[in-house]
Amino acid sequence: AQPATPLLAYRWVDTDRALADQLALEDEGQAGTLSPGHAAVRFTNPTTGADVLPTMRTEMHRVRAGGATRVHREVGSSVFQVFDGSGTVTVGERTWQVARGDLFVVPSWQPFSAQASAAGALDLFRFSDAPIFEALHSHRVQVTV
């Protein structure tokens, strides 16, 4: 059997640069982020563009210091790890402080948002089961603008 991806290591230096470049494009007035102050990189198979794993999506998100993501909800569950930084996250009606090393879960169709502290960016590693719901043609995302 072939591995899901020929790339066995996704280097932080490359991920960090991609996130920083997206935010730099935003600073120059160009589109490059998911929303103001919120950049993301999806880890993919470089030969196919598909997710690294057939049933799991992996991403790294960066929220600029003092910035916040838009509130969104989607079909499928996600697990986040705070890779670096600190801030607050809101899942459903519950809000709490997070810092480096913390893990939190966002259940299916629960509203979610994250805000970075004023002291620095908030880097979040996310994995989700979105590819399963996409294959079933039942993946939905709702973003509050």
Regions found by a protein language model. Give the residues of each.
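A short beta-strand-loop-beta hairpin characteristic of the jelly-roll/cupin
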Residues: A68, R73-R100, Q110, S138
